[in-house]
Amino acid sequence: WDGAIWPFATSQTLTGLANYLNSTETPVVTDSVFFRQMELYVESQYRRGRPYIGEYLDETNGQWLMGDRERSRYYNHSTFNDLVITGLVGLRPRADRTLEVHPLVPADKWDWFCLDNVLYHGRNLTILWDKNGDRYHLGKGLRVLVDGKEVGHADTLGRLVCPDVL
């Protein structure tokens, strides 16, 4: 191994960390670790001041390697969107009729976020966090809507399980 940073391997590692945080009652790391690693992953996806993802980065200086070769710029097979949806926003895929959300955003990081118009089990899903209640005007907290109807609410960020709503 030459030490280079590979976006796909980073995605796999972050997915594993998200799964660990979602499946362990008392994890030895916190959502803050996941969030910081996601920040670093996002920050790495620039080249010459523009959004870019390639095959791999130099581990010491963060520069994209092979960036001027044609094959590198078509190398986006990371799972970035999945990390945002299932990790940060916290939609936890399930086969049953239960909707489970567990955002891995530390409570002191974002005042609001919204994932909207997601087709999930044939239903239209919205997940939103509004710390103060003044962004989306639906009240404070974490809310889950299915087909426009609220099916779950929590005052704080954390696991929210909504049984038999799908």
Residue ranges and their predicted role:
Residues W1-R123, G133:
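Non-catalytic carbohydrate-binding regions of carbohydrate-active enzymes
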Residues V118-N124, L128-L166:
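C-terminal beta-sandwich/jelly-roll accessory domains of carbohydrate-active enzymes
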